[in-house]
Regions:
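Glycan-recognition and catalytic cores of secretory/periplasmic carbohydrate-active enzymes
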Residues: 2-430
Length: 430
């Protein structure tokens, strides 16, 4: 259909979208090899990096897609350099590390605490690395974090965003499904999926379901338009604020709904749909049709933009992709197309795409965030691809949209025996 075509899907523009390489693993391998060579030359110097937002998932995904062992070797190399960050009394990692010398610490603005999302968003990658190398140390480090968090897990499943790496206890801080909290909850569900939903990973699902009850307790509805939104919590008070970052939640809820019984599954899926409607309207209620960074909700006024920049974030289109695949409702494709057209109109420039300093005026900034290529465009690509392309039955996406192959139970013989590498199955049009 005409609405799904664009000049950015042909010619030289296709090379800017990593989704282009999903069906071309050899070109992916060549592109990523150049990146790896350049990046590791930089990392060999005194580089201070976050243990969270790195490329281990991208390297493992490239290995799964291409079968080229260079990516597995480099994933192991960089992870070995990161491991000193986990050498804390509690096992909760520091969030910054110098890769050349292995010295780790937390940023000053957290008062020495570790960030929940940073500490709880390596499990997929580290488990996958142990599966593919046969070395259990990576999985052990990641799962020790979850064991520590289980000790302090509250009855509502909602953890504050700051955790003390020495005592392993939660510090008084905000509870949110937005910045610094989000992907911890996402990974509880996805590790359960990665583990083939077996008894061995049942505790991840149980923790996730507990947290979803907590999410329900944070959910309110606006007037007059009945938009559902997820509050933040500070102490005993709820704040009527929702980050666009929290718009990953509808997709997460939809992905996890089928694990419940029929009645609860319907409730969770309906909430996913309602939250997706809200997130779509984050976009539709501004003059540029692009969402602000966060929104505030006031009685009788529905929603209002808080921080008014847009930096090309992927969370809403991510959820639309999940909901389209899991419901078959093409409304989610229509909504995704509207968002893509708004990016084309407001953010497209000759050399790429840029964010907006203000979604009300349309004033542009001068930066294309890397996640626009890695996530936003990839999820849009998948939103308009058959569900067999990177099928949910065979793959699980990490929080940076890198697909990791799910190792079948018959091949997952336990850590210590490397799993065999599969040939990639190409998705076929329906």
């Amino acid at each position: 259909m005409a609405r799904r075509s664009s000049s950015s899907s042909s010619g030289t523009w296709r090379y800017l979208n990593p989704a282009y390489y999903l069906k071309r693993p050899k070109r992916l391998a060549l592109l990523f090899f150049v990146f790896v060579a350049a990046t590791f030359a930089f990392w060999d110097r005194q580089s201070l990096v976050s243990e969270y937002e790195l490329v281990v998932g991208g390297l493992l995904s490239s290995y799964d897609l291409s079968g080229d062992k260079v990516f597995l070797d480099k994933a192991k190399d960089i992870t070995d350099r990161l491991l000193p960050a986990w050498d804390t009394t509690s096992g909760i990692p520091y969030n910054r590390i110098n890769l050349a010398h292995g010295r780790a610490h937390n940023p000053g603005w957290t008062n020495g605490d570790s960030i929940l999302a940073d500490s709880g968003t390596e499990q997929l990658e580290f488990i996958a690395l142990s599966q593919r190398t046969g070395d259990p140390k990576y999985q052990q480090k990641a799962e020790n974090v979850i064991k520590q968090l289980q000790k302090i897990y509250p009855s509502d499943g909602l953890l504050p965003i700051y955790i003390n790496p020495h005592s392993g206890t939660a510090s008084y801080s905000t509870i949110t499904f937005g910045a610094m909290g989000d992907s911890f909850y996402e990974y509880l569900l996805k590790v359960w999926i990665q583990g083939n939903k077996t008894e061995h990973v049942k505790h991840y699902r149980q923790m996730w379901e507990t947290s979803m009850e907590g999410l329900l307790s944070l959910t309110k509805k606006t007037t007059p338009s009945n938009y559902y939104y997820i509050c933040e919590k500070n102490g005993g008070s709820l704040s009527d604020k929702m980050d666009e970052l929290a718009c990953f939640a509808p997709g997460m809820l939809a992905l996890g709904a089928s694990g419940y019984g029929p009645e609860k599954s319907e409730q969770i899926m309906n909430l996913a749909k309602e939250l997706a409607r809200t997130c779509y309207n984050f976009y539709q209620t501004t003059p540029t049709k692009l969402a602000g960074e966060n929104y505030f909700f006031h009685t009788g006024q529905d929603m209002g933009v808080g921080t008014s920049w847009n930096i090309l974030r992927p969370e809403t289109v991510e959820s639309l992709m999940y909901l389209w695949r899991l419901t078959g409702n093409k409304t989610y494709q229509d909504w995704g197309w509207d968002i893509f057209q708004a990016f084309e109109k407001n953010s497209r420039i000759e050399s790429g795409y840029v964010g907006l300093r203000d979604v009300n005026t349309g004033e542009k900034d001068n930066m294309m965030q890397s996640f626009f290529l890695a996530e936003t465009l990839k999820y849009l690509y998948l939103l308009f691809s058959p569900p067999s392309v990177i099928s949910f039955d065979e793959w699980v996406f990490n929080t940076e949209a890198h697909p990791l192959r799910i190792v079948p139970v018959s091949d997952n013989k336990g850590i210590g025996t490397p799993v065999r590498q599969f040939g990639r199955k190409q998705g076929k049009p329906e």
